[in-house]
Curated annotation (Swiss-Prot):
Function: Part of a sulfur-relay system required for 2-thiolation of 5-methylaminomethyl-2-thiouridine (mnm(5)s(2)U) at tRNA wobble positions. Accepts sulfur from TusA and transfers it in turn to TusE.
Assigned keywords, A-Z: Cytoplasm, Transferase, tRNA processing
Keyword Nucleotidyltransferase: no
Enzyme class label: transferase
Family: Belongs to the DsrE/TusD family.
GO cellular component terms given for this protein: sulfurtransferase complex
Molecular function in Gene Ontology: sulfur carrier activity; sulfurtransferase activity
Residue positions of the active site: C78 (cysteine persulfide intermediate)
UniProt-listed Enzyme Commission number(s): 2.8.1.-
GO biological process, one term: tRNA wobble position uridine thiolation
Name of the protein in its database record: Sulfurtransferase TusD
Protein source organism: Citrobacter koseri (strain ATCC BAA-895 / CDC 4225-83 / SGSC4696)
Amino acid sequence: MRFAIVVTGPAYGTQQASSALQFAHALVNEGHELSSVFFYREGVYNANQLTSPASDEFDLVRAWQQLGAQHGVALNICVAAALRRGIVDETEAKRLALASANLQPGFSLSGLGALAEASLTCDRVVQF
């Protein structure tokens, strides 16, 4: 089966994002196709390059990055939700005259069209 995941919880503070990551790993381990993960609302914090967990804590941001790189999963961040929460790539940082960007490499800013496309092309869309 072909899956897409929607993550609406932040990297830390709730269990939504970590549960979504565990589910994503279970999918690929069972041979399913995970085409994309769409981070929406507070979920965009999973792409913040400046997140710095303590050395004895799990680094969820880098774990998402590794999932995307190892399994070819698109990591899409809702651009509107990201901008509201201060998450920007180089292009948006320049456009908005910000000092720097903080979007973790491997993630892409995208619109709700990416979520709509995933909904149309996947067998299942699971939200966390």
